[in-house]
């Protein structure tokens, strides 16, 4: 059926009036499309391209800012780790110094206590020796006076006690 239509059109010849009408209509339609559709479409495409370009630029700037923030954060983290390490080191040094001070102070206190104890012991020993010396002197006098049956004078008594104490001192030294 299509073939008969085409054959009939060719047999009659070309209708130049219709052909020109179609071409003029096509050109008018093309001008209208260009004026009302093509220009707004190209404007819209240009705006879209500009927006995409701006979005890409904004994304690049945001990426750069993010990288800068990451670098700043890494630097701050590194600095805080360094500061923490320094604080720990200082605390350790202070602790060691306090430990040494405490040990030194305790050692000095022990030495002082030992010295005081030695002084006290020496003083007590001397007091005990003096007391024993007096007791021995009194006992010696009593014994001597009973043996001799006479009273010794104070000088005789003192000489007797001194000689007795010297004898005791020599006995203690030999031990």
Curated annotation (Swiss-Prot):
**Family listed:** Belongs to the ATPase B chain family.
User: Is Nucleotide-binding one of the keywords UniProt gives this record?
Assistant: no
Query: Per the UniProt record, which residue ranges are transmembrane?
Result: 13-33
The name this protein carries in UniProt is ATP synthase subunit b
Functional summary from the UniProt entry: F(1)F(0) ATP synthase produces ATP from ADP in the presence of a proton or sodium gradient. F-type ATPases consist of two structural domains, F(1) containing the extramembraneous catalytic core and F(0) containing the membrane proton channel, linked together by a central stalk and a peripheral stalk. During catalysis, ATP synthesis in the catalytic domain of F(1) is coupled via a rotary mechanism of the central stalk subunits to proton translocation.
**Primary location recorded for the protein, binned into one broad class:** membrane
Q: Which GO terms describe its cellular component?
A: plasma membrane; proton-transporting ATP synthase complex
Describe its assembly: F-type ATPases have 2 components, F(1) - the catalytic core - and F(0) - the membrane proton channel. F(1) has five subunits: alpha(3), beta(3), gamma(1), delta(1), epsilon(1). F(0) has three main subunits: a(1), b(2) and c(10-14). The alpha and beta chains form an alternating ring which encloses part of the gamma chain. F(1) is attached to F(0) by a central stalk formed by the gamma and epsilon chains, while a peripheral stalk is formed by the delta and b chains.
Q: How does it sit in the membrane?
A: Single-pass membrane protein
Cellular compartment(s):
Cell membrane
State a single Pfam family of this protein: ATP-synt_B
From which domain of life does this come?
Bacteria
The record's section on CDD domains has: ATP-synt_Fo_b
Keyword terms, alphabetized? ATP synthesis, Cell membrane, CF(0), Hydrogen ion transport, Ion transport, Membrane, Transmembrane, Transmembrane helix, Transport
Q: Which organism is it from?
A: Ligilactobacillus salivarius (strain UCC118) (Lactobacillus salivarius)
Which InterPro entries does the annotation name? ATP_synth_B-like_membr_sf, ATP_synth_b/b'su_bac/chlpt, ATP_synth_F0_bsu_bac, ATP_synthase_B_chain
Keyword Transmembrane in record: yes
Q: What GO MF terms are annotated?
A: proton-transporting ATP synthase activity, rotational mechanism; proton-transporting ATPase activity, rotational mechanism
């Amino acid at each position: 059926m299509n073939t008969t239509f085409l054959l009939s059109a060719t047999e009659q010849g070309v209708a130049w009036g219709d052909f020109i009408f179609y071409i003029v209509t096509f050109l008018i339609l093309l001008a209208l499309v260009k004026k009302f559709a093509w220009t707004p479409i190209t404007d819209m495409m240009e705006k879209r391209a500009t927006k995409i370009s701006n979005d890409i630029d904004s994304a690049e700037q945001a990426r750069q800012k993010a990288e800068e923030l990451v670098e700043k954060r890494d630097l701050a983290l590194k600095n805080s780790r360094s500061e923490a390490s320094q604080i720990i080191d200082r605390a350790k040094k202070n602790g060691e110094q306090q430990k040494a001070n405490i040990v030194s102070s305790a050692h000095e206190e022990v030495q002082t206590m030992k010295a005081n104890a030695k002084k006290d012991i020496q003083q007590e020993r001397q007091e005990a020796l003096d007391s024993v010396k007096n007791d021995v002197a009194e006992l010696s006098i009593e014994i001597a006076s009973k043996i001799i049956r006479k009273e010794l004078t104070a000088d005789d008594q003192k000489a007797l006690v001194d000689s007795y104490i010297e004898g005791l001192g020599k006995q203690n030294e030999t031990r």
